[in-house]
């Protein structure tokens, strides 16, 4: 499975570097940064260039923000069948989950898995402490 990361400024490249720092090399992750000097068409062209011929059905695009330019460009490509799916809300825990599972699941299985566990990607110390205190009461 090929994973294309698309984000504002240099978030895509930074996220790939962070994943590699923790997980190891991820050659199937392809970061695309959307800079202030670019428009929708130039970003779309960069994404199309990153999709390997013959691998559209096994290409997942992950963007930083729902409804932002990276997401909109990616969604258009998915609707045109140039990629399998697009997921918004890129974060390090999500990308580590993708790195672990990308070679063991299809795109649709991985997307379904991510949607099931997405609430595990963030937490609050005070919430954890409250939950643990309630559990200790029993």
Curated annotation (Swiss-Prot):
Induction: Induced by L-sorbose and repressed by D-glucose. The active site is at residue 8. Its main location: cytoplasm. One of its GO terms (molecular function) is kinase activity. Coiled coil: none annotated. One of its GO terms (biological process) is phosphoenolpyruvate-dependent sugar phosphotransferase system. The modification Phosphohistidine is found at residue 8. GO terms for cellular component: cytoplasm; membrane. Residues 1-125 form the PTS EIIA type-4 domain. Keywords: Cytoplasm, Kinase, Phosphoprotein, Phosphotransferase system, Sugar transport, Transferase, Transport. Gene3D superfamilies: Phosphotransferase system, mannose-type IIA component. It is found in: Cytoplasm. The phosphoenolpyruvate-dependent sugar phosphotransferase system (PTS), a major carbohydrate active transport system, catalyzes the phosphorylation of incoming sugar substrates concomitant with their translocation across the cell membrane. The enzyme II SorABCD PTS system is involved in L-sorbose transport. The EIIA type-4 domain is phosphorylated by phospho-HPr on a histidyl residue. Then, it transfers the phosphoryl group to the EIIB type-4 domain. This is PTS system sorbose-specific EIIA component. It comes from Lacticaseibacillus casei (Lactobacillus casei). The lineage of its organism: Bacteria, Bacillati, Bacillota, Bacilli, Lactobacillales. The gene is sorA.
């Amino acid at each position: 499975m090929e994973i294309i990361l698309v984000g504002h400024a240099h978030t895509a490249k930074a996220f790939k570097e962070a994943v590699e720092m923790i997980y190891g090399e991820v050659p199937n992750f392809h970061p695309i940064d959307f800079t202030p000097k670019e428009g929708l068409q130039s970003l779309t062209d960069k994404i199309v260039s990153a999709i390997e011929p013959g691998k559209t059905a096994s290409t997942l695009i992950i963007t930083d923000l729902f409804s932002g330019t990276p997401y909109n460009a990616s969604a258009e490509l998915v609707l045109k069948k140039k990629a399998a799916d697009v997921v918004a809300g890129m974060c390090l825990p999500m990308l580590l989950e993708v790195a672990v599972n990308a070679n063991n699941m299809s795109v649709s299985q991985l997307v379904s898995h991510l949607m099931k566990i997405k609430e595990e990607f963030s937490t609050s110390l005070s919430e954890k402490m409250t939950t643990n205190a309630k559990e200790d009461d029993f």
